[in-house]
Amino acid sequence: MDAPLVNESVEFQESQESLSLLEASKQLDLKKIQNLVDQGAVTSAIDIESGKNALHFIASYAEKETEVQAIEVTKWILSNGGVWNGIDRANETPGCIARRRNLLRLYETIVDAGVRSELLLSLLERKELTNEQLDTNEKYLQSALSYTQPTEDSSSLLDSDANAVMMSWERKIMHRSAEIIAPTKGRRVLNVGFGLGIIDTFLQEKEPSLHVIIEPHPDVLKHMRKNGWMDRENVIVYETTWENAINDIASKYVFDGIYYDAFAESYEDLRNFFDSVVGLLDPETDSKFSFFNGLGADNQTFYDVYKKLVPIDLVSFGLQCTYESMPVSSKDEEWKGAKRRYWDVSKYFLPIVTFDF
């Protein structure tokens, strides 16, 4: 599941006032920064050589004894156009630097700013599904997928651009997720996105009374047929997108457990699915919903922003979210053949979503 966060800073030949603002940021000099902004400096300016903006420099030069001062300056810059998620030449956000330097209160200030920013951004974008996202989904469904084996004991599913759709190192996550949404045998379960079939295999071990799978990609469906999934007892496969299947499913079934792991979809798509969860979960049982929480997982700051954002969004649907943390790791050789790593954090936060009553 894709979850890009905007991380652009203004990059051009900065004015002298803006360059002076960057220097003042190193000194945590709020009054000087305010005066420079009055003179035309922009808080989103970056140092061309390092790629750092004012918030990067604050996080780099603040110390424990000046952290309160750094937070004050950071809040002012953020409220006056500062970029919380700019990435420097070292591939770090201001939050990454603060966290690395153990300035945890400053880090939380930046993360909270990210949450507010993403809430506002999602409200603006929610008015219409962009053509770009529709094109991304369509491109994925038309691309050729390949099942690969990077190492003797690992497997991957890659798209035609070598993007990893699913990898076997996720097995530990999927096993625990299956235990959460189907703690006992005989449950009614729904999974969106088959991939390598990891969680569906674990769910089958629970002998569900109903097991609905939504999978739109023709290559994955071919793989499922080859391995007999269409013929399994109590398994129903919808060979389409969840958006196309959801009304029919909702008219026929309710579930004790739901899992979502759709590839080539954005956070906004996931948020739209939250609305469907309300009508699909059985309110009369201890029903639970979960999803693969890879939101922003190529960067710790982004991951923590989404960790806070999801529960806030779920409240509006009458749902509540808690997290169960678990260490995860993957070997470098397991990523062989994949274009980029979509996972670069050491701890997984497994979302457990229930009705808020």
From Swiss-Prot:
List residues of the RMT2 domain. Answer: 130-357
Its EC number is 2.1.1.-
Q: Extract the SUPFAM superfamilies matched here.
A: Ankyrin repeat (SSF48403), S-adenosyl-L-methionine-dependent methyltransferases (SSF53335)
Xref: CDD domains: AdoMet_MTases
What InterPro entries does the record point to?
A: Ankyrin_rpt-contain_sf (IPR036770), Arginine_N-MeTrfase_2 (IPR017408), RMT2/GAMT_Mtase (IPR051038), RMT2_dom (IPR026480), SAM-dependent_MTases_sf (IPR029063)
Assigned keywords, A-Z: Cytoplasm, Methyltransferase, Nucleus, S-adenosyl-L-methionine, Transferase
Annotated Gene Ontology cellular component terms: cytoplasm; cytosol; nucleus
Q: Where does S-adenosyl-L-methionine bind?
A: 140, 174, 194-199, 215-217, 242-243, 261
What does the entry give for GO biological process? Answer: methylation
- Segments spanning the bilayer are none
Q: Which GO terms describe its molecular function?
A: protein arginine N5-methyltransferase activity
Q: Does the keyword S-adenosyl-L-methionine apply?
A: yes
Report if keyword Magnesium is assigned: no
Subcellular compartments: Cytoplasm; Nucleus
Q: What is said about its interaction partners and assembly?
A: Monomer.
What is known about what this protein does? S-adenosyl-L-methionine-dependent protein-arginine N-methyltransferase that methylates the delta-nitrogen atom of arginine residues to form N5-methylarginine (type IV) in target proteins. Monomethylates ribosomal protein L12.
Q: Which family does it belong to?
A: Belongs to the class I-like SAM-binding methyltransferase superfamily. RMT2 methyltransferase family.
Listed name of the protein: Protein arginine N-methyltransferase 2
Name the species this protein comes from: Schizosaccharomyces pombe (strain 972 / ATCC 24843) (Fission yeast)
The gene it comes from is: rmt2
